[in-house]
């Protein structure tokens, strides 16, 4: 495991929001939480925030269909608003880095993060997490057997996202880094820590 976590977290210049996003089972939550721990950063996960807003326990299973139950557009909107509120509150307390973890499948939702962060004098870095379909299947099978899993992502959700996910346009979203998560977490943390966008 990398050993420069405290140095990196303390050396960040200004406010920064790190958004780990991608489709279900892309590895974003594993990496986002590891990065937040690595940097001693504040961390917020959309699955947890959504269930808090719905009055549910984080590990309570809700196999609702797309756009149904706790996954309606209205609650999704509230979830992303709450994520931004948390980040804003942290910045007001002089927190340097906030990590947001969620699908952020629409560019409009990513742009809202950019707008809020810029309004507070900060900057964003988006990490677009990807992996092969074979790995998605493997991870979803493991998740289905894990009683502590927070995400309700399933194969049908993945198939829906394949059709609807607004992938980042490198020409218009130049603050995005694409990362294949089929590698050791420690190696990914070292790679991220070396990125020029995090050096100042």
Language model features: what each stretch is:
Residues 1-17:
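Extreme N-terminal, non-catalytic leader segments
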Residues 20:
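Hydrophobic anchor at the beta1->P-loop junction of P-loop NTPases
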Residues 24:
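The conserved Walker
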Residues 28:
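Conserved lysine of the Walker
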Residues 33-93:
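Conserved substrate/cofactor phosphate-moiety recognition/catalytic segment
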Residues 48-51, 104-106, 130-137, 183-185:
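Conserved nucleotide-binding/hydrolysis micro-motifs of P-loop NTPases
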Residues 120-140:
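Conserved phosphate-donor/acceptor-positioning beta-strand/loop module used by diverse small-molecule
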Residues 145-191:
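Small-molecule kinase domains that catalyze NTP-dependent phosphoryl transfer to phosphate-bearing small molecules
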């Amino acid at each position: 495991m990398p050993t420069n976590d405290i140095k990196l977290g303390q050396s960040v210049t200004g406010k920064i929001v790190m958004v780990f996003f991608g489709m279900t089972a892309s590895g974003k939550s594993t990496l986002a939480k590891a990065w937040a721990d690595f940097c001693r950063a504040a961390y917020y996960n959309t699955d947890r925030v959504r269930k808090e807003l719905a009055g549910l326990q984080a590990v309570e299973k809700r196999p609702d269909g797309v756009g149904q139950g706790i996954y309606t557009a209205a609650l999704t909107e509230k979830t992303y608003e709450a994520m931004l509120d948390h980040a804003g509150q942290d910045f007001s307390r002089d927190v340097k880095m906030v990590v947001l973890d969620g699908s952020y499948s629409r560019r409009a939702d990513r742009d809202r993060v950019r707008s809020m962060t810029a309004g507070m004098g900060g900057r964003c870095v988006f990490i677009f997490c990807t992996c092969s379909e074979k790995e998605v299947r493997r991870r979803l099978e493991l998740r289905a057997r894990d009683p502590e899993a927070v995400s309700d992502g399933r194969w049908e959700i993945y198939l829906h996202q394949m059709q609807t996910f607004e992938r980042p346009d490198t020409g218009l979203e130049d603050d995005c880094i694409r990362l294949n998560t089929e590698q050791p977490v420690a190696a990914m943390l070292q790679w991220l820590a070396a990125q020029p966008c995090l050096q100042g």
